[in-house]
C-alpha cells in the first residue's frame, strides 16, 4: 500500500470535518469530489451555494455529499462576527469590520468555523499565499499550548528509495520561517520529530543540516546550526538528534560512517532540518522535481488546531493528500 493510502485509511478510521474555503478554484472542487468518493473526511465548502454547484457541474464534479456554507446567508455568521470582534477588540476591530472580513474573506470564515468547533480543521492555499493562509490562523486560533513557534514542514515520499523511512522524510522548515535563530531551529526540530512520529508512525531520527559536517567548515551559518543542535539535545534528551551534517552524511550510511563516525544519527536520518527557508524550499522542490517525490505540504505545526497550507502549484490529488494528513492531525487532538 502506498504511504498516502495508509494516511487515507487512518483518516477514514475516525472521520473529521475539514473546511475547504477556496471554492473558486476548480482543483478544490475536483479534490472535494475525490475526498467524498473515498470517504476520507466530511467537507464544508465555503461560498455562494449556487455558484459553487454551478462550477462543480461545469467541471463534472460530484460534491453533493459536501455541506456548502454561504457566509452571506448562514445563521451562524452573526455569532462568528461577535466572536471575531471579541478576539480582535484589542486591535480595535469593530463589528462592521468583522462583518466585512467574514463576508468577503472566506479563509477567515473557515478559520472561525474551526475556532467555534463547527469544523475540525481547514486546508487552503491553492490560490492564496502562505501568509494569507496563516494570518487568520495566528490571529484567531493562536499557538498550541506550550508552543512558542509555528513552523511548517513537507512530508516527502521518495519512490524506490533506500534512505529515510523507506523513502519517507519530513523536511522542516520548508515553508514558513525565513531565517530561524538557534532557539527557533531547535524548536522546529522538536516539532518536526513529533510530526514525523504521528504521520509515519516510526521513530524520528533528526539531522540538523548544514554545508558542514562536524566542523568540516567554519562560518557563522555553521555556528548557528551547531548551537541549535546543542539546544535541541538539551531540550529533548531522549530524541535521536545530531548535527551538523551535510545531506549525504545525514542519510547515506557509508558517508555518515566516514564523515561522522560514532554518531547515532549519521546515515540514518528521516527528519531533515534545514538551516533556513531558502535551503528548505529548494531542497523539497529538488526532491519533488528531480527524484519524482510526492511532496505534501507545507503542513503547519504549532497552531492550536490543524490548519494546513498548499503550494499554489498543487494538484487536486495533492489537496486530497493534505486533507487526509489534516484529518490525522485532528485525530491526534481527540
Predicted regions located by residue number:
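Anion-binding alpha/beta catalytic cores of soluble intermediary-metabolism enzymes, centered on
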Residues: 1-266, 271-334
Amino acid at each position: 500500500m502506498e504511504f498516502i493510502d495508509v494516511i487515507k485509511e487512518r483518516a477514514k478510521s475516525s472521520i473529521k470535518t475539514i473546511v475547504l474555503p477556496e471554492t473558486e478554484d476548480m482543483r478544490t472542487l475536483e479534490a472535494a469530489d475525490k475526498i467524498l468518493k473515498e470517504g476520507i473526511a466530511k467537507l464544508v465548502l465555503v461560498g455562494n451555494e449556487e455558484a459553487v454547484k454551478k462550477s462543480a457541474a461545469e467541471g463534472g464534479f460530484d460534491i453533493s455529499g459536501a455541506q456548502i456554507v454561504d457566509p452571506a446567508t448562514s445563521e451562524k455568521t452573526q455569532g462568528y462576527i461577535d466572536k471575531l470582534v471579541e478576539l480582535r477588540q484589542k486591535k480595535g476591530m469593530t463589528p462592521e469590520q468583522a462583518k466585512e472580513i467574514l463576508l468577503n474573506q472566506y479563509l477567515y470564515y473557515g478559520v472561525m468555523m474551526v475556532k467555534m468547533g463547527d469544523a475540525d480543521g481547514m486546508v487552503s492555499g491553492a490560490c492564496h499565499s502562505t501568509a494569507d493562509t496563516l494570518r487568520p490562523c495566528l490571529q484567531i486560533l493562536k499557538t498550541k499550548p506550550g508552543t512558542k513557534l509555528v513552523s511548517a514542514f513537507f512530508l516527502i515520499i521518495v519512490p524506490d528509495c533506500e534512505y529515510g523511512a523507506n523513502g519517507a522524510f519530513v523536511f522542516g522548515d520548508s515553508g514558513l520561517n525565513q531565517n530561524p535563530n538557534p532557539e527557533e531551529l531547535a524548536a522546529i526540530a522538536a516539532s518536526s520529530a513529533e510530526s514525523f512520529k504521528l504521520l509515519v508512525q516510526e521513530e524520528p531520527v533528526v539531522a540538523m543540516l548544514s554545508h558542514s559536517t562536524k566542523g568540516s567548515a567554519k562560518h557563522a551559518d555553521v555556528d548557528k546550526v551547531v548551537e541549535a543542535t546543542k539546544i535541541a539535545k538539551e531540550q529533548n534528551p531522549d530524541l535521536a538528534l545530531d548535527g551538523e551534517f551535510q545531506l549525504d552524511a545525514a542519510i547515506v550510511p557509508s558517508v555518515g560512517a566516514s564523515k561522522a563516525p560514532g554518531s547515532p544519527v549519521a546515515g540514518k536520518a528521516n527528519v531533515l532540518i534545514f538551516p533556513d527557508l531558502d535551503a528548505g524550499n529548494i531542497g523539497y522542490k529538488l526532491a519533488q522535481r528531480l527524484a519524482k517525490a510526492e511532496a505534501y505540504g507545507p503542513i503547519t505545526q504549532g497552531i492550536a488546531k490543524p490548519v494546513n497550507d498548499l503550494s499554489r502549484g498543487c494538484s487536486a490529488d495533492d489537496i486530497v493528500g493534505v486533507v487526509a494528513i489534516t484529518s490525522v492531525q485532528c485525530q491526534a487532538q481527540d
